[in-house]
Amino acid sequence: MYLIEPIRNGEYITDGAIALAMQVYVNQHIFLDEDILFPYYCDPKVEIGRFQNTAIEVNQDYIDKHSIQVVRRDTGGGAVYVDKGAVNMCCILEQDTSIYGDFQRFYQPAIKALHTLGATDVVQSGRNDLTLNGKKVSGAAMTLMNNRIYGGYSLLLDVNYEAMDKVLKPNRKKIASKGIKSVRARVGHLREALDEKYRDITIEEFKNLMVTQILGIDDIKEAKRYELSDADWEAIDELADKKYKNWDWNYGKSPKYEYNRSERLSSGTVDITISVEQNRIADCRIFGDFFGQGDIKDV
């Protein structure tokens, strides 16, 4: 498995939109003889699921006040807040695409690594989460792109939970379905569960430990790296500017509608909003934290 990190001219890039653009660019243009791993951490960011309505998922006043980045990813699932207290493990898998949709198998390398580091109570739970003593410490998403699985998951070492609680506005039905009253009550952190010798590690050290465990190597220096060229980085910058830093992609048009219906289904939350003019449906939008195999506009 190749390792690709957001390192440019020796500098670690902590811009979450750049990290996302890098992964998508590689998926579209770089084809190697093995799978690819993209580990990264970034500045405070809210990542929105492909099919979600950003306007109802985030506290925009809090985002503006604290300069938190909002980026929409290409995979489904729900909104997540991450910062430099979380490691994001993304990947491109083409050696065995039968894993698509099977989050238990997808998570196995991470679970094994966390258990080795002392967090032996971490388990795969629900549709696409990892939990520690009943609290969520990771959420995963994946999609099929170019006949390859593109996906990833966050690992919450110890993020800013106050910011997480204030910036996200999760669907009340989703929260109620889990028997909890707030985001903070639902989310845990991994640091306290690690073996004592790892509890004071930095986020960089945690990232490297996870990478070495997943790749089965003793030192991060042993990883098989793929280095992006200057031309690659220029294309990544362009993609980030045109898409992942573009308001139309991240927010889009979120007008008010006359009718709204939200339901919590086995596949996730589905929110349908309809505008009616002269007794005819003028517009219909479908949002949610579900995982789709196509584009909503095709429905």
Describe each model-derived feature in a short phrase.
Residues A55-A79:
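Active-site cofactor/substrate anionic-group-binding motifs, chiefly glycine-
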Residues A141-T143, L155-L157, E263, V270-F290:
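Short beta-strand elements
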Residues D74-E94, I175-L194:
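Residues forming anionic-ligand binding surfaces in small-molecule and nucleic-acid pockets
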Residues D121-G126, L130-A185:
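Internal, well-ordered alpha/beta segment that forms a basic, Gly-enriched binding/recognition surface
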Residues L93-I99, Y161, E192-D200, G288-G292:
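A generic structural motif
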Residues K174, K178-D195, E277-V299:
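A hydrophobic, small-residue-rich beta->alpha segment in the mid-to-C-terminal subdomain
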Residues A86-R127:
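Contiguous, small/hydrophobic- and glycine-enriched helical/loop subdomains that border
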Residues M1-A55, M142, K181, V187-K207, ...:
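Active-site loop/lid in soluble adenylation, ligation, and acyl-transfer enzymes
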